[in-house]
């Protein structure tokens, strides 16, 4: 038969028998049920067979006895399939049901053969061995060929019946799990983490509500500046967890990268690092076991004492915030209810103060410390009670000034000392843990120390310091945000500018391409004037600036003026000159001097000192010099209702601080400050309307110029900057304009020229050329003041010489504008109110140097037998004794009386050594009653009687 022929057999209904699938495995109940079904099927098949042989018996259909099999999709038929007739007397066995892909199975043998093979005494076999077949003729059909995909005739184990399915109830008698606590907590939603950040407010930047309310209510700061919008989100992104314990398992906290802040002067750099410090340490105030004894956690370094004191004042204002506002203004019910403790205090360490007092502060603990580099390194090396191992912040403010003053090695020593103390403290904690504890472990060692470097300019020196002190720093600049805001306002997006900004945000500009950017609202002007008109032009300019303030014009921009000079001698001279001159009273001053001379002539020779100066005049001069050093401010008839102040590095610390405080105090009355470059860095002096650069900067070039003019036009307010330029220095204007500007596409900075005649006319007033006569009168008054006293003349000569020395220190790049050969020394002497020729000034200065006392080395060489104590007493005698160091007039008079009493029994001016030639020490003691015995007490008795 051909291979493509497939046979189909018709099975009569009477011969239909269900084939029971073999049962393997399973439960014992299933096996019993299978045996029972097999026995019933065998009985039914036997009954059907008997019915076929005896037709008279009633016919019972097999379908009524055996359950119907599952519906199987019939195999496809072909037209060429041959059908074979079935004999009526025979029963055709049903085909075996296999999978859909299998072909027809072999015909089963007859029931008789199947039954004959089973012994009568044997039990019914298992379902797996039972096979129901019906007898068919061997020649009834031929087996068709199997298709290629046909499987085996026996059922595969994978073809077992499907797993029985069960439908169960959702709820049973078992109780459902409940909440452990009796009261279910309310689930609160946190702040949105993917919401846009509002950088225009402190709240949007993530600042604490306590600090926001304090800034707005007490300090008048409502919105952040550009540099604060840039750096605050990053520096506030890693708050402290006060509940963290040492040794807690969890993800290790990665420390923040160090920060480099570059922004203009007056842009808010101080608050940019003070706010993150205070907010980071504030959560520790909720812990009752944290107090000042924890040590120093933040250190701020400033280059000068004045800047350090200013930072300390701002920090104290921040730390005086009210903690009561936290619960009143808080809407978060889950906020920590633990109260705050006031353990955050600030401390100030500067040179010139008493180290003993500073050690007492450090022993108690100063969490936030403001210091100058030298004094901090001194305490790190010598003060064992200084606990700074846990320092979390180190701020270097005005880094460019720190490098200019030569603090690079000092800063490196500070960093090494901090690292050493940190390692020692960690090792001590480890040793204590091995021994069984005993100390509180610090849980924030893994945070490390965040180093912050602030500077208005970034040059090669600052880059070197950043490389040594910072670790993978992040640079923040305010100009980038301003450029982006301007670009958004114009609706432009330049890919070139964007790429330039991104490059500048990463790469620090080199010194040769650096641009120094002053505030854009600053009005910069310069005056080209002859050298001999400098002094009267300064007076005229100050009068015009002060008069506008007195009339109520531009009061909002400030009522104060700063005048920068090149030397400390020039500051002292101009301050005393403008404060001491008396217009129209020169004759009275001359008469007073004549009377003093007549009194001096009437004195006897015995009352004169060895140098020819009378004792009364000398003591009067000493008292006058003492009182002059204590004076903080002066008044001048040239500037009505105006106070004059001075500031330079050679002043005593107490005088410097008092002068700076008096000038910085807000007042409706105008004031003028004469200062050196010590006032050009970091000082936030409020209400400064104008800056006058009477002497152009000698060191620093454009950098120093920008820092000087940055004392005004701060925090968005207006201001003026004036520069005095001689005709030979006029090329400096174009040079400084080229040095200033912005590297991000802004237009350059231009200095506007103002005529000297306009300045004089506006300052002195009058019609036509009347200002010339008034300026001449002022110049003559200055010259008469210099001639009135030798001390004033010496002060003017020293200021003149200091100006020439400072003028010669301009860098090589500026020598084309500033050279001593270009100076007219005669006109320059006129600007210092001197009538002497420059040659005579040089001889007078050399004569003054020759009159100076011998140094200690020379004295020791001359008198090798002198003790150090004797030399110190000689030096004290030459300086005027203890009278100059007296705290009040009574103490000074007491010192003077004791010294006068000692002269009667002294030898060589030393009290306690008695004269007497040819006598040994024992004879002297016997004759005088003992060493240090006062022979006559009349002077002391007269002094006490006069006081009564």
Swiss-Prot record:
Give the motif span (Q motif).
Answer: 200-229
* InterPro entries associated with the record: DEAD/DEAH_box_helicase_dom (IPR011545), Helicase_ATP-bd (IPR014001), Helicase_C-like (IPR001650), P-loop_NTPase (IPR027417), RNA-helicase_DEAD-box_CS (IPR000629), RNA_helicase_DEAD_Q_motif (IPR014014), SPB4-like_CTE (IPR025313)
Span of the annotated motif DEAD box: 397-400
Q: Which residues form the Helicase ATP-binding domain?
A: 250-476
UniProt xrefs under Gene3D superfamilies: P-loop containing nucleotide triphosphate hydrolases
Q: Where in the cell is it found?
A: Nucleus, Nucleolus
Compositional bias segments (type: Basic and acidic residues): 605-616, 878-899
Enumerate the residue ranges of region (Disordered).
43-160, 583-626, 844-929
EC code: 3.6.4.13
Any single GO molecular-function term of the entry would be:
RNA binding
Bias regions of kind Polar residues — which residues?
A: 50-62, 77-89
Gene Ontology CC: nucleolus; nucleus
Ranges of compositional bias, category Acidic residues:
593-604
List, alphabetically, the PROSITE patterns matched: DEAD_ATP_HELICASE, HELICASE_ATP_BIND_1, HELICASE_CTER, Q_MOTIF
Q: What is known of its domains?
A: The Q motif is unique to and characteristic of the DEAD box family of RNA helicases and controls ATP binding and hydrolysis.
According to its UniProt record, which protein family does this protein belong to?
Belongs to the DEAD box helicase family. DDX31/DBP7 subfamily.
Q: What does this protein do?
A: ATP-binding RNA helicase involved in the biogenesis of 60S ribosomal subunits and is required for the normal formation of 25S and 5.8S rRNAs.
Report what the protein is called. ATP-dependent RNA helicase DBP7
Origin organism of this chain? Answer: Cryptococcus neoformans var. neoformans serotype D (strain JEC21 / ATCC MYA-565)
């Amino acid at each position: 038969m051909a291979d493509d022929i497939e046979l189909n057999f018709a099975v009569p209904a009477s011969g239909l028998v269900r084939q029971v699938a073999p049962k393997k495995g399973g439960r014992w109940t299933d096996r019993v049920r299978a045996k029972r079904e097999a026995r019933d099927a065998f009985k039914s098949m036997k009954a059907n067979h008997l019915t076929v042989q005896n037709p008279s018996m009633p016919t019972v259909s097999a379908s009524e006895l055996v359950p119907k099999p599952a519906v199987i999709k019939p195999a496809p038929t072909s037209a060429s399939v041959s059908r074979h007739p079935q004999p009526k007397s025979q029963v055709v066995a049903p085909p075996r049901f296999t999978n859909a892909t299998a072909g027809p199975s072999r015909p089963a043998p007859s029931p008789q053969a199947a039954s004959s093979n089973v012994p009568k005494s044997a039990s019914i076999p298992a379902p797996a061995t039972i096979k129901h077949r019906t007898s068919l003729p061997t020649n009834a059909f031929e087996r068709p060929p199997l298709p290629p995909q046909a499987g085996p005739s026996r059922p595969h184990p994978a073809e077992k019946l499907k797993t029985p399915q069960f439908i169960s109830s959702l709820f049973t008698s078992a109780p459902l799990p409940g909440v452990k606590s009796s009261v279910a907590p309310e689930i609160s939603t946190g702040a949105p983490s993917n919401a846009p950040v509002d950088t225009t407010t402190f709240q949007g930047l993530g600042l604490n509500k306590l600090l926001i309310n304090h800034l707005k209510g007490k300090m008048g700061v409502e919105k952040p500046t550009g540099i604060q919008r840039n750096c605050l989100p990053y520096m506030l992104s890693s708050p402290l967890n006060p509940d963290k314990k040492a040794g807690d398992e969890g993800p290790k906290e990665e420390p923040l990268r160090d920060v480099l802040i570059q922004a203009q002067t007056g842009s808010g750099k101080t608050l940019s690092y003070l706010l993150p410090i205070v907010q980071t340490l504030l959560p520790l105030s909720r812990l009752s076991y944290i107090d000042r004894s924890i040590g120093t956690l933040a250190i701020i370094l400033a280059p000068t004492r004045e800047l350090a004191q200013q930072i300390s004042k701002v920090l104290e204002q921040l730390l005086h915030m009210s903690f009561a506002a936290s619960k009143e203004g808080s809407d978060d019910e889950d906020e920590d209810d633990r109260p705050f403790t006031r353990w955050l205090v600030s401390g100030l360490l500067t040179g010139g103060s008493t180290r003993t007092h500073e050690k007492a502060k450090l022993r108690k603990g100063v969490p936030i410390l403001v210091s100058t580099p030298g004094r901090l390194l001194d305490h790190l090396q010598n003060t064992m009670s200084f606990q700074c191992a846990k320092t979390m912040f180190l701020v270097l403010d005005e880094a460019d000034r720190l490098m200019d003053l030569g603090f690079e090695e000092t800063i490196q020593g500070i960093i090494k000392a901090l690292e050493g103390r940190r390692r020692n403290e960690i090792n001590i904690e480890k040793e204590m843990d091995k021994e069984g504890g005993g100390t509180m472990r610090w849980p924030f060692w893994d945070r490390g120390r965040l180093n912050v470097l602030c500077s208005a300019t970034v040059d090669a020196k600052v880059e070197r310091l950043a490389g040594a002190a910072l670790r993978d720093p992040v640079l923040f600049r305010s100009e980038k945000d301003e450029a982006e805001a301007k670009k958004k306002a114009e609706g432009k997006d330049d890919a070139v500018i964007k790429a330039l900004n991104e490059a500048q945000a990463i790469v620090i500009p080199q010194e040769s391409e650096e641009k120094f950017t002053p505030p854009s609202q600053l009005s910069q002007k310069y005056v080209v004037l002859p050298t001999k008109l400098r002094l009267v032009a300064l007076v005229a300019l100050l009068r015009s600036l002060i008069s506008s303030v007195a009339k109520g014009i531009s009061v909002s921009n400030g009522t104060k003026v700063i005048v920068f000079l090149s030397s400390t001698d020039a500051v002292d001279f101009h301050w005393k000159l403008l404060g001491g001159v008396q217009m129209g009273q020169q004759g009275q001053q001359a008469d007073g001097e004549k009377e003093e001379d007549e009194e001096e002539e009437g004195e006897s020779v015995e009352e004169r000192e060895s140098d020819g100066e009378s004792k009364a005049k000398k003591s009067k001069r000493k008292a006058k010099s003492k009182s002059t050093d204590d004076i903080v401010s002066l008044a001048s008839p040239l500037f009505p209702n105006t106070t004059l102040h001075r500031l330079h590095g050679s002043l005593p610390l107490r005088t410097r601080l008092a002068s700076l405080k008096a000038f910085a105090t807000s007042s409706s009355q105008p004031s003028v400050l004469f200062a050196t470059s010590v006032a050009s860095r970091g000082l936030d002096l409020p209400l400064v309307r104008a800056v006058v650069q009477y002497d152009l900067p000698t060191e620093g070039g454009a950098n120093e110029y920008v820092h000087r003019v940055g004392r005004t036009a701060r925090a968005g307010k207006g201001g003026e900057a004036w520069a005095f330029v001689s005709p030979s220095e006029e090329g400096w204007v174009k040079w400084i304009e080229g040095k200033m500007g912005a590297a991000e596409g802004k237009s350059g900075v231009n200095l506007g020229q103002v005529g000297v005649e306009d300045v004089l006319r506006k300052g002195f007033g009058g019609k036509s050329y009347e200002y010339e006569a008034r300026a001449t009168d002022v110049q003559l008054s200055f010259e008469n003041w210099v001639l009135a006293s030798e001390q004033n003349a010496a002060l003017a000569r020293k200021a003149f010489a200091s100006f020439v020395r400072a003028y010669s220190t301009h860098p090589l790049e500026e020598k084309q504008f500033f050279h001593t050969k270009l100076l007219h020394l005669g006109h320059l002497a006129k600007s210092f109110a001197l009538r002497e020729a420059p040659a005579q000034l040089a001889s007078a200065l050399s004569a003054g140097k020759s009159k100076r006392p011998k140094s200690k080395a020379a004295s020791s060489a001359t008198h090798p037998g002198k003790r150090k104590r004797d030399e110190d007493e000689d030096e004290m005698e030459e300086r005027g004794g203890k009278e100059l160091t007296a705290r009040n007039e009574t103490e000074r008079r007491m010192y003077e009386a004791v010294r006068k009493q000692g002269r009667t029994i002294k030898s060589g001016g030393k009290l306690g050594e008695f004269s007497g030639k040819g006598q040994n020490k024992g004879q002297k003691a016997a004759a005088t009653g003992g060493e240090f015995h006062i022979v006559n007490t009349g002077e002391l008795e007269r002094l006490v009687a006069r006081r009564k």
